[in-house]
């Protein structure tokens, strides 16, 4: 079960020098921010999310930031099975039980809590070269995740072009809440055959180019490539074996491939209109992987400015995706 997703901000500093003195001092101004999100879908899911962040200069060429996230999700999620009146199922919270008569075995309840911390350090090596170093970890009821990343941004002398190159690595441990294990793929749910914790490693590389076309227009192009190896299966998902009439005979734990290679290309155009200084933001993204999944995303936002502090920003997003090669018809 995957879900949900990320955003940040900036700070200032002053360099003070005194007459003939060679020493320099940094006025270390830190910014702090906090936010709370509540989201609910009737008879489906409820989300509570609390975020705290701080960022500031630690030297004339270095900035540091920390972000802490606490969120909880509860509700119901599809199991992958067809509707049933009596077969066993495993819930997304890790608990197992029998679907009561008259209820749908295609849904199960879940209750998940996550705590995450992200650290960032940015160093200005030269006037036109900055490198960001990142580290993060998160702990959930059924997952532990650790990641590191480094991204270099190089500008030309006029700062009208910026090249970006980044690499990231992630290590995940996946398990079910009760038992700290994962079901053996493609085995009957009724047999309750389990293995140890699942492990997955992921490596991602991104290359990008940002260009200032004119004083009101910028364009951006990003290419990304990623490889994941290890446990790729959702330990709570099952599928049903049915007869020609659609009546369920049995349930099996799902089993996905143990590797995945993916790539994407994204293009973005930002333009400020004249007169009015309204903002136009157009983004297109194409994604493909070796599971035969392909997707197209088109996103457009238009910001209408009213006075100095007020604005209205309608947004439209179009998305299409096909199914994986192993997904049943």
Where are these regions (language model features)?
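Transmembrane beta-strands of outer-membrane beta-barrel pores
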Residues: 36-40, 70-74, 135-141, 154-156, ...
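Hydrophobic, lipid-facing positions within transmembrane beta-strands of outer-membrane proteins
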Residues: 30, 48-52, 115-119, 146-150, ...
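Outer-membrane beta-barrel translocator/channel fold
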Residues: 67-117, 162-218, 229, 313-329
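Extracellular loop and loop/strand-boundary signature of outer-membrane beta-barrel proteins
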Residues: 37-40, 103-107, 134-139, 149-153, ...
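Outer-membrane beta-barrel translocator domains and adjoining extracellular loop/strand segments
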Residues: 45-49, 67, 77-83, 136, ...
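Outer membrane beta-barrel transmembrane domains
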Residues: 86-106, 226-228, 232-270, 286-299, ...
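Outer-envelope beta-barrel architecture signal
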Residues: 26-32, 60-64, 115, 127-131, ...
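Solvent-exposed loop/turn segments connecting transmembrane beta-strands
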Residues: 39-47, 109-115, 137-147, 257-261, ...
């Amino acid at each position: 079960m995957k879900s949900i997703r990320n955003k940040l901000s900036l700070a200032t500093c002053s360099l003070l020098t005194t007459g003939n003195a060679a020493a320099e001092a940094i006025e270390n101004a830190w910014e702090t921010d906090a936010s709370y999100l509540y989201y609910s879908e009737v008879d489906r899911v409820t989300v509570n999310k609390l975020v705290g962040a701080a960022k500031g200069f630690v030297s004339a060429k270095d900035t540091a930031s920390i972000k802490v996230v606490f969120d909880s999700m509860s509700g119901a999620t599809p199991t992958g099975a067809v509707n049933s009146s009596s077969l066993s199922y495993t819930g997304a919270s890790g608990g197992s039980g029998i679907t009561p008569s008259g209820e749908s075995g295609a849904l199960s309840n879940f209750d998940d809590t996550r705590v995450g911390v992200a650290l960032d350090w940015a160093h200005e090596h030269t006037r036109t070269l900055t490198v960001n170093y990142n580290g993060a970890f998160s702990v959930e009821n059924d997952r532990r995740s650790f990641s590191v990343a480094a991204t270099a941004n190089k500008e030309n002398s006029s700062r009208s072009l910026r090249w970006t190159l980044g690499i990231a690595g992630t290590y995940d441990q996946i398990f079910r809440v009760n038992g700290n294990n994962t079901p053996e793929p493609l085995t009957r749910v009724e047999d309750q055959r389990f293995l140890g914790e699942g492990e997955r490693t992921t490596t991602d590389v991104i290359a990008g180019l940002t260009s200032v076309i004119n004083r009101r227009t910028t364009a951006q192009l990003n290419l990304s490539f990623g490889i994941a190896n290890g446990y790729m299966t959702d330990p709570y998902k099952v599928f049903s074996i049915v007869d020609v009439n659609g009546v369920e005979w049995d349930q099996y734990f799902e089993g996905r491939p143990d590797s995945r290679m993916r790539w994407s290309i994204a293009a973005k155009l930002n333009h400020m209109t004249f007169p009015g200084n309204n903002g136009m933001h157009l983004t297109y993204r194409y994604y493909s992987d070796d599971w035969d999944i392909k997707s197209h995303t088109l996103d457009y936002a238009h910001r209408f400015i009213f006075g100095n502090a007020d604005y209205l920003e309608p947004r439209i997003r179009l998305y299409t995706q096909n199914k994986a090669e192993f997904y049943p018809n």
